[in-house]
UniProtKB/Swiss-Prot annotation:
This is Bifunctional riboflavin kinase/FMN adenylyltransferase. It comes from the Bacteria. It is an enzyme of class 2 (transferase). Its cofactor is a divalent metal cation. Gene3D superfamilies: HUPs, Riboflavin kinase-like. Higher divalent cation concentrations lead to decrease in the turnover of riboflavin and the 5'-phosphotransferase activity, while the adenylyltransferase activity increases. Belongs to the RibF family.
Length: 338
């Protein structure tokens, strides 16, 4: 899949494309409807399937304090887009100047002159151009004989609008199961493993892979979760009994560790029944279900007792996840309860 940063990077010999436009944060099931329609049309007419996304998020340009937390990084968006069959992603730097482009110029410059589009797919709530004056209907009017426009209805399921906002709300409530339902996949974060306080293995007997994220990143509410940890592809050797690209069962703590008075929020993953030196390795942490809320305990002994129960519940939830997703045995490691 090709990735272009800015319109100037798009090859001049791109002669036909089917295009979908949006921020696509999370690449949730609603986004997938747009992407699938774009890929289907591209294959039908022998065109390239192109996704246009914006970075930074448009809201952050005009209302920085109200900018939504990011569900996916650009790199994660790219990987998800490719998995659905997108041939190329154009990343546009969203600026105030760009937002002042008239809808007509927007179509002429982006869709016709740059991407040579024959077809464009947008959601029913799509807006574009100066003061967001362009809508899905006006896009149809502007394009008319120039290219075809497919407007996709927003996705409602079980009375819930599937949107990035909905996903963020589920995460803020700690309801990762519902977030996963809206996403059509496990919510996950990726990043390097860094050194934490060191008490997990030495003091508690539960060594963890620690990750820290910027406060612009969407994370589940503070609590303990069942999930999977996967070491991302690497040429560096992994010391221990874990290997890259295998999902290992993990009990995941999100929060500040109130029992020990920590202040920095982190994601700490205790991998069940495996042990490896993961420092410096990039890992993917997938959240499957909520285990319990974050608590402050009166003693380390009380904490250890509850953590043992967390591990037991994690095994049960992940065994159910394996069955629900019919996971191939070679893709994961989950040891049965002894």
């Amino acid at each position: 899949m090709d990735i272009w940063y800015g319109t100037a990077a798009v090859p001049k010999d791109l002669d036909n494309s089917a295009v979908t436009i949006g921020v696509f944060d999370g690449v949730h099931r609603g986004h997938q409807k747009l992407i699938n329609a774009t890929v289907e049309k591209a294959r039908e007419v022998g065109a390239k399937a192109i996704m246009v996304t914006f970075d930074p998020h448009p809201v952050s340009v005009f209302l920085p304090r109200r900018a939504p937390l990011g569900i996916t990084t650009l790199a994660e968006r790219f990987a998800l887009a490719e998995s659905f069959g997108i041939d190329g992603v154009l990343v546009i730097d969203f600026t105030r100047e760009l937002s002042g482009t008239s809808p007509e110029k927007y179509v002429e410059f982006l869709l016709e002159d740059t991407l040579h589009a024959s077809h464009v797919v947008v959601g029913a709530n799509f807006t574009f151009g100066e003061n967001a004056a362009g809508t899905a209907d006006s896009l149809r009017q502007i394009c008319q004989s120039r290219l075809t426009v497919d407007v996709i209805d927003l996705l409602d399921d079980e009375g819930v609008r599937i949107s990035s906002t909905t996903v963020r709300e589920f995460l803020s409530e700690g309801d990762v199961a519902r977030a996963n339902w809206a996403l059509g996949r496990h919510f996950y974060v990726t990043g390097p493993v860094v050194r934490g306080a060191g008490r997990g293995g030495k003091e508690l007997g539960f060594p963890t892979a620690n990750q820290y994220f910027h406060d612009t990143v969407a994370l589940p509410a503070d609590g303990v979760y069942a999930g999977w940890l996967t070491i991302l592809p690497t040429e560096a050797p992994v010391s221990g009994n874990m290997e890259p690209e295998v999902a290992y069962a993990a009990a995941i703590s999100v929060g500040t560790n109130p029992t020990f008075g920590d202040e920095q929020r982190s994601v700490e993953s205790f991998v069940l029944d495996r042990d490896a030196d993961l420092y410096g390795h990039d890992v993917k942490v997938e959240f499957v279900d909520h285990v319990r809320a974050m608590e402050k305990f009166d003693s380390v002994e009380q904490l250890l007792e509850v953590m043992a129960k967390d591990v037991q519940k994690t095994r049960t939830l992940l065994a159910q996840d394996v069955q629900a997703h019919k996971m191939a045995p070679e893709t994961y490691f989950l040891q049965a309860e002894s």
